[in-house]
């Protein structure tokens, strides 16, 4: 049993390497841009700083894509499913935040509960699991267009709704605990 747990965690670790590999360039851009060196024009510094900040601000979706790709042998459909799932997750969390009276934040133009990178990793894992299970699914002929890989983003969207509802109850106390540190 421990061997299978270790193997699973090893797969997750490998999947996280792709999004982690983006962090150095984000740090370099942000650092050089924010330093406003005299040799670099102010406009170029501002562009670099904003570019690095944009990467750091998008880490959740970057991790969603990276985890999905890492757990599906780099199949692009899983990346699309992760993006669809992440956006649906944000929308669901936003609706639930309003219903529960929980603080929300503008993320990618959507008012939502901010789960940070955790939400991206979760939805990336869900997208990958659904891809690995359903990428060969056969549907009745009248739904044939949606069979196979085309089914994966659809089922991921519905899974993201359920995940968002569950996270809307679980994340606020967890997030508050993290903020307390």
Q: Could you tell me what each predicted segment is?
A:
Residues 5-147:
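Early transmembrane hairpin of solute transport permeases
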Residues 23, 157-164:
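Alpha-helical transmembrane segments of multi-pass integral membrane proteins
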Residues 58, 160, 168:
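Conserved, well-structured beta-alpha core segment at the onset of a catalytic domain
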Residues 149-159:
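Small-residue-rich segments of transmembrane alpha-helices in multi-pass membrane proteins
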Residues 164, 171-181:
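Aromatic-rich transmembrane-lumenal/periplasmic boundary elements in polytopic membrane proteins
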